[in-house]
Design a protein with these regions (language model features):
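Residue-level detector of well-ordered alpha-helical segments, enriched
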Residues: 125, 213, 265-269
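AMP-forming adenylation/ATP pyrophosphatase catalytic core
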Residues: 4-29, 51, 57, 86-88, ...
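Substrate-binding/catalytic subdomain of NAD(P)-dependent oxidoreductase enzymes
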Residues: 211-219
């Protein structure tokens, strides 16, 4: 076996027992060499079933001939090929939109215990590092492309990431491989192409090992980010106490353990926490965290992000997104209380036990409501909610059950959610706040 084959087999060792290997096959040099290497290796090694995926973006006329080229090579190698046509959304960055469309297709086609293999190499890693450096990225961004990560229900692996492009070219020439040269790759109005064709030749003439050095720096940053993530998990463990209002279904953290940290550790912990919800705020936007953290104790500060918000209430910070940012629709008649009632944009409501008689209606708080409480008589709802400590942001979404225009119960709040004699209980299952940042 060639050194390149040995290096590839070693990189793929953790996935030798996967259900399938899919090669992201553009038809270019990188993916052509990767597919050819794998097709040769499977002749002498027991490997998972191998297939190829070609994504047709439909962005240029030349691309219409590429599926046929890919099919011919796959036929020669005996590898099944799937061609997927995607629609690229118009936007400011055509490169990013095409990448997003491509990876959406890959996510849909990669099942559990399956691996998508891509052909990025060391020169690509160096370009990514420099591109992000010029955009002012932090340690996480400068870590560039990881060797592996999750992809939908499966995994993505870049087994050639430590291999220089020159080695791939030499392999292709040795085996008389032909590949597609994308005409758009010479357009220097694309940022990556500008770096590849204008900047890197200058750098490598002065520093021949520039690409290798940048890739090594990216590896150092990845290791540093791993330590930062480990520290963040430790700090978040201190703040991850259970709230009495966990039934709201919202992600939340106890504020005091976070604010006891240094400002840098606060941001590190919150970056790690918010990363699971989507894109992180940029450097200038972190002033919103300072304002939320330092607001008066009796204030209700909000940090507004792209598609979500952080609220501070009850000594905690709460992540809200999606339906939680929209006013639910009310009132609603509940004609059959034996069945759960779907609340538009607000989950569902159900009555446990023997339903009360009369005309049932569900409303939301408007202000000035009064209800009768066992052994306490008539009480203002506002005072009752204050006694319960329910966060203000949740009060306008809390379902109120009326019978013949009388406020009878408040969902989920002990002592207010059931009949005086215990014949029934009002239970609310809120909508999930699962929409992340954009």
């Amino acid at each position: 076996m060639s050194n390149l084959s040995i290096q590839l087999l070693k990189a793929l060792e953790p996935w030798r027992n996967a259900r399938a290997w899919h090669v992201a096959f553009s038809g270019g040099l990188d993916s052509t060499v990767l597919l050819h290497l794998l097709a040769q290796l499977r002749q002498i090694h027991s490997l998972p079933p191998l297939s190829a995926i070609h994504v047709h973006h439909g962005l240029q006329a030349a691309a219409d001939a590429w599926p046929a080229h890919c099919q011919a090579l796959c036929d020669d190698l005996g590898v099944p090929l799937q061609v997927v046509r995607v629609h690229v959304q118009a936007g400011a960055s055509l490169e990013r939109a095409a990448r997003d469309a491509r990876y959406q297709a890959f996510v849909a086609l990669t099942q559990a215990q399956e691996v998508l293999l891509t052909g990025q190499h060391r020169d690509d890693q160096a370009e990514t590092f420099l591109f992000r450096l010029l955009r002012g990225a932090g340690v996480s961004g400068l870590a560039a492309m990881p060797h592996q990560r999750g992809l939908g229900e499966g995994d993505l692996c870049r087994p050639l990431l430590d291999v220089p492009r020159a080695h791939l070219e030499a392999y292709a020439q040795e085996h008389n491989l032909s590949w597609i040269e994308d005409p758009s790759n010479v357009r220097t109005d694309f940022s990556r192409n500008y770096l590849r064709h204008e900047i890197f030749p200058l750098l490598t003439r002065r520093w021949p090992q520039a690409a290798a050095s940048m890739a090594r720096s990216a590896s150092h940053c990845a290791e540093a980010q791993g330590l930062l993530d480990e520290l963040a998990r430790q700090d978040l463990q201190e703040a991850g106490s259970v709230s009495e209002f966990d039934w709201l279904g919202l992600q939340s953290l106890e504020l005091a353990p976070i604010t006891s940290l240094s400002p840098a550790r606060q941001r590190n912990a919150l970056r790690h926490w918010l990363a699971a919800l989507g894109l992180l705020p940029d450097t200038d936007h972190w002033a919103g965290w300072d304002a939320l953290r330092d607001a008066r104790a009796d204030a209700q500060p909000v940090w507004k992000l792209a598609e979500g918000q952080l609220h501070r209430a009850g000594g905690r910070i709460w992540w809200m997104a999606g339906d939680w940012l929209r006013q639910p629709i009310a009132p609603m008649q509940w004609d059959n209380p034996l069945l759960p009632l779907a609340l538009p944009g607000n989950g569902q409501l159900q009555l446990l036990g023997q339903a009360p008689g009369g005309s049932l209606q569900v409303r939301y708080r408007q202000g000035g409501e009064v209800m009768t409480v066992k052994n306490r008589g008539h009480r203002d709802l506002k005072r009752l909610l204050n006694e319960q400590g329910l966060p203000l942001f949740a009060r306008g979404r809390l379902p109120l059950l009326y019978v013949n225009e009388q406020l009878l119960a408040v969902a989920n709040l002990p002592g207010l959610d059931c009949s005086p004699c215990g014949r029934w209980q009002l239970q609310w299952l809120p909508t999930k706040s699962d929409q992340g940042l954009s």
